[in-house]
Amino acid sequence: MQRAGATTPSTSPIAQVRTPAPLARNNIVTYLATQFDSLDVRGISDVDSLVLACVSYYQLPDVATAARTPEGMPIVDLYRADWFEGLTLGLWDPEGLVRLLGSIVASPRFRTIRLCDYVSETDFGSEQQFSACTLRLPTGDVYVSFRGTANSIVGWKEDFNMAFETRVPSQSRAVRYLERAASFAEGRVYVGGHSKGGNLAAYAAAMCDQATHARIAAAFSHDGPGFTRETLSSPSWKESAGLIHKTVPRSSLIGMLFEQQEDFSTVESTSVGVLQHDPFSWIVDGVEFRRADGLSGGADFLDR
């Protein structure tokens, strides 16, 4: 983990071309500011999942030792001005992520969450970059959040390895992490992620052991890359297909990578092209994403 104040040039293709997305009139931040139902009244939706998937992007400091245990720490304890720079250093939208954290800790739906079992690992030898956390919800359920692609050569190289290998190191690690998280959970298990994190969430939900699989209520992939033909034709995947909910923006490029795709729904975005990968650009109407009729021409071409 990098210390606050360190500077590392971003190697992410998206980060290099990114300009701040036009703020959606209604996005996940305004959703948190306007929707106050408890999770007992209205359960986890794909909009909620995108919020919780983004939590795994925060890079916790070494002093946050409680967050690395099964008991965890209150998520409100993350909201410290002296931590903001380190939490978001090198990420795609530091200001947006700080704003999101403030909205989470103010939200009646999520402000009592505990952040548990945070891990962040990089292995240059196996070309693995992996980070995840478990969010203990006020209902007694948990949401396992897998981080998306980090702005590093290792992170992007592993993403491209997914196009050619049926099981890359971070996918194997995600399965083990999910099984451990489920063993500590009292209630149902939700799992999700954005970008590569969505791929890891779907893969782990499909390939975990039967005891864990029986606990999973839903798995969410938010513009996560797809899978090889071998993975999608496996018995484990076919058994799990009904649990997996994939959302992609209309001009999705990242989520349409790889030879075949699982089923998905399409959402509207305020950005264009590859910038639609930014979750803050996804439009929310009320408590749901604004659905699009289908993919744009470029994204549809990638899906063929």
Predicted regions: what they are:
Residues 201-210:
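Short glycine-enriched nucleophile-adjacent loop
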Residues 188-190, 203:
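Catalytic cysteine-centered active loop of the rhodanese-like fold, especially the PTP/DSP P-loop
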Residues 3, 12-47, 52-66, 70-112, ...:
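Alpha/beta hydrolase fold serine-hydrolase catalytic domain that processes acyl esters and thioesters
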